[in-house]
Amino acid sequence: MKNRLKGKTALVTGATSGIGEAIAGQLAELGVNLIITGRRKERLEKMAAVLEDEHNIKVTIGTFDITDRAACEKFINSLGADPIDILVNNAGGAHGVDPVYSGDFKDWDTMIDTNVKGLLTMTRLISPGMKKRNSGHIINIGSIAGHEAYPGGVVYCAAKHAVTAITKSTKMDLTGTNVRVSQVSPGLVETEFSMVRFKGDKDKADKVYEGMQPLTADDIAEIVVFVANRPDHVNLLDTVVFPVAQSAATMVARTSP
């Protein structure tokens, strides 16, 4: 596959683990300079040292909470005038599986603030530069939950449906420019996602992937890199990625233990 990404700069949010970490790693392999952000400073520093050493690229880290708009603005302003060619809005997550009549307000706020407002903030801060340069690519990490609803997912599904709408509307807003806008929407991916959703209950988290082979973070990263590496005139708007055992949000073929 032709490498069209070498020498570009990508900003990846939520890069300290899982899909974000995998995306950063695979972009680094193609010679992409990185700006990686998250809340775990030590983890970001370790990643930066390894990626710079192994791939001879520049890695900048940003330690802040994506839900803190002022912190986002301060960090982006600190980067100066160097262009960000690719924005990967990866930070997100689900908290709890409560039905709407007993949901936790704090969990709801966290999901909306992270999945929706954080994504909007980063897009608002970075897209003007892309528009001015008439070049760039915004890639949002969505979910099958952004295409289907399911029980116990009322706010997470709503948040990811919002991401789908934001992706489509952003593409429309940038019509007439050469800025590309994409979304990658995974199904079941085995990462820290379920541990966070079930608040550290490993037994419940493991059952999500029981009796089937889920996707890995690297599987999704490979798709993101593929989307980013298309020719400049090619825009993949939304790519849904399932493990072969999954056909819908709640339709999964499982084998007995």
Model-derived features with residue positions:
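Residue(s) in the substrate-gating loop at a strand-loop-helix junction
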Residues: 143
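The beta1-alpha1 cofactor-binding region of Rossmann-like NAD(H)/NADP(H)-dependent oxidoreductases
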Residues: 42, 63-74, 105
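Conserved glycine-rich Rossmann-like NAD(P)H-binding loop of the short-chain dehydrogenase/reductase
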Residues: 32-47
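C-terminal helical subdomain
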Residues: 183-187, 191, 203-249
